[in-house]
């Protein structure tokens, strides 16, 4: 049976068909749906981990215990998991183990576009790259077999277009792979004397065998066409782009097993074509190795090294051809930057925080990163998961040295706090920093699509779980001053910020209100209520001062002709932030509907 599937769905299906029993992940675009789809298969135990390192380590534990396992994460998550990965690369596996890295060329939803293929080379492990959904499923099965055959974790490298594009997939049946009975092995105790032996084995055996396999496997295949004037080496979605523009005018060496590279096959292919192109997104990973082998090729000297590729780009840079462009007046196209949703509980907090002109606001990765956009213009920085608190701590130390009156405020969400914020908070406690650290608790992992976390009370399969209380954790870490506020009540927020900045030691402020898009649980309804309202503007009272507009709510719009503000009732949820900032009290409830949830 064939089914139209995204790459993420196909990876999940491949995990099921290959006999995987354990899967762990931390959500992050474009990888999130991999574990969400895996969780639909009862034969695979699946879990959201607090962060990528924990996901990797849990999958390692499952492998050591004898089961096939995987960990999935976006590209920057591999940085977090790298500590575990680079040592597990030495020890090898018992049950097959695959790490899925979902890279994001073009930065669709990421702070960088790092090329994680280099992790395979750094770790000296096998790497596989599918070019469509069928291969995503099939290659997952192959990856598990390669992992066990060569005693190596396997890096499955996919990109946004592979993850989210759909192609037809031929479905197969599940193969039940027995759990290997556990036996204690010295290789899993990598003290220096053991690791020396393991490293030697990698160089003298694993990589030698993987190179031989790379040259022999059908995962790396040649397609001869025409007069062989043009040869193309490519992998992943870039292969599809190359095929689209060159069709049968070129011959192809399609790389599916991309580390170690099949250098003998590449040399043979290159010797039989007149002009050799290496087409790959982002870094010249393949090109560098090919040129290092003394093979002449055309790559990044013509093909862009930044952002995504597409057929139009390749056609222009390689063939000198351009598709017709539809001309339009871009001045009439509205500028629509990303913004916090109407009713977002973060809006009121940042509106009040930004009023403190002496505040240095160190934000983090999540919806609240949008607080740096106009009109809020609140945050000063955002770096990586957990950095909000750490940067605030370091900055405050320097402000104090300089005799500045600047006050650092660290900001992160609830899921980020569980991810890597706890150690950052502990740093500010241990090293006596007078910072205000804020946790925006919207009761869910928001930006990636409402995944559960240790604070929500549910697992990925909807089973009840222990709720970890952020306030109690903060106290346990040594914070003496902890306060919880409703972020929709601006007077409370204003007073709480002032309170938090008054101490000469760390203080924690928790804003607690569910994401406006979240379907409320019974527990949420008991705590926050079960309602939805609509606000409206009284045109007789509105003076067009646009104080409400400065909150950045997309439900509000200003009419230049009438010089009045109106509210889109399809978006409004009556969070009342706009009503509270209106100096003329021109905004009030329109109707109350008992439909929330």
Predicted feature residues:
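Flexible, low-complexity linker and terminal segments
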Residues: 1-8, 18, 130-340, 345-348, ...
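Thiamine diphosphate
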Residues: 1-133, 161, 225, 287, 372-510, 516-523, ...
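Short acidic, glycine/serine/threonine-rich loops at helix termini
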Residues: 34-37, 60, 81-85, 107-114, ...
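Short helix-loop-beta junction
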Residues: 37-43, 243-253, 472-478
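A glycine-rich helix N-cap at a beta->alpha junction
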Residues: 43-50, 91-102, 180-188, 430-443, ...
């Amino acid at each position: 049976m064939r089914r139209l599937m995204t790459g993420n769905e196909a990876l999940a299906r491949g995990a099921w068909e290959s006999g995987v029993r354990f899967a762990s992940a931390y959500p992050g675009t474009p990888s999130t749906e991999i574990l969400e789809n895996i969780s639909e298969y009862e034969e695979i135990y699946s879990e959201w981990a607090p962060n990528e390192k924990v996901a990797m380590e849990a999958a390692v534990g499952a492998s050591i215990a004898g089961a096939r396992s995987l960990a999935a994460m976006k590209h920057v998550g591999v940085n977090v998991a790298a500590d575990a990965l680079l040592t597990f690369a030495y020890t090898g596996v018992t049950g097959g183990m695959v790490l899925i890295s979902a890279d994001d060329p073009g930065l669709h939803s990421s702070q960088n576009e790092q090329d994680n293929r280099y992790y395979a080379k750094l770790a000296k492990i096998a790497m596989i790259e599918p070019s469509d959904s069928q291969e995503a499923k099939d290659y997952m099965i192959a990856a598990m077999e390669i992992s066990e055959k060569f005693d190596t974790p396997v890096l499955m490298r996919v990109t946004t277009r592979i993850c989210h594009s759909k192609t037809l997939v031929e479905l197969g049946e599940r193969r039940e792979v027995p759990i290997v009975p556990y036996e204690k092995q010295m290789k899993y105790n990598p003290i220096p004397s053991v690791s020396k032996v393991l490293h030697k084995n990698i160089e003298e055996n694993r990589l030698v065998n993987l190179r031989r396999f790379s040259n022999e496997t059908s995962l790396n295949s040649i397609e001869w066409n025409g007069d062989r004037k043009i040869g193309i080496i490519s992998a992943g979605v870039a292969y599809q782009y190359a095929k689209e523009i060159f069709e049968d005018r070129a011959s192809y060496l399609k790389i599916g097993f991309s580390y170690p590279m099949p250098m003998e096959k590449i040399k043979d292919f290159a010797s039989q074509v007149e002009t050799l192109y290496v087409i790959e997104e982002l870094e010249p990973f393949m090109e560098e190795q090919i040129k290092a082998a003394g093979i002449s090729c055309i790559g990044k000297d013509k093909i862009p090294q930044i952002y995504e590729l597409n057929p139009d780009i390749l056609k222009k840079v390689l063939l000198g051809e351009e598709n017709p462009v539809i001309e339009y007046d871009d001045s009439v196209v509205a500028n629509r930057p990303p913004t916090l949703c109407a009713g977002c509980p973060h809006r009121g907090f940042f509106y009040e925080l930004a009023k403190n002109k002496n505040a240095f606001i160190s934000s983090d990765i999540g919806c609240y990163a949008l607080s740096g956009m106009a009109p809020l213009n609140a945050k000063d920085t955002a770096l990586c998961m957990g950095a909000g608190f750490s940067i605030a701590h370091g900055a405050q130390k320097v402000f104090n040295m300089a005799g500045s009156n600047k006050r650092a405020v660290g900001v992160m969400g609830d899921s980020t706090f569980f991810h890597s914020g706890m150690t950052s908070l502990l740093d500010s406690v241990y090293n006596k920093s007078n910072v205000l650290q804020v946790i925006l608790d919207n009761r869910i992992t928001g930006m990636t699509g409402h995944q559960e976390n240790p604070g929500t009370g549910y697992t990925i399969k909807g089973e009840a779980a222990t709720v970890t209380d952020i306030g109690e954790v903060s106290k346990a870490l040594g914070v003496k001053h902890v306060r919880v506020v409703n972020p929709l009540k601006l007077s409370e927020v204003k007073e709480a910020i002032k309170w938090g900045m008054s101490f000469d030691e760390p203080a924690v402020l928790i804003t607690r209100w569910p994401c406006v898009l979240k379907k409320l649980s019974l527990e949420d309804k008991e705590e926050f209520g079960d309602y939805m309202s609509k606000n409206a503007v009284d045109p007789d009272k509105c003076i067009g001062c646009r104080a409400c507009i400065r909150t950045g709510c997309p439900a509000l719009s200003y009419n230049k002709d009438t010089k009045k503000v109106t509210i889109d009732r399809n978006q409004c949820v009556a969070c009342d932030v706009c009503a509270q900032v209106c100096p003329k009290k021109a905004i009030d409830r329109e109707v109350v509907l008992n439909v929330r949830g």
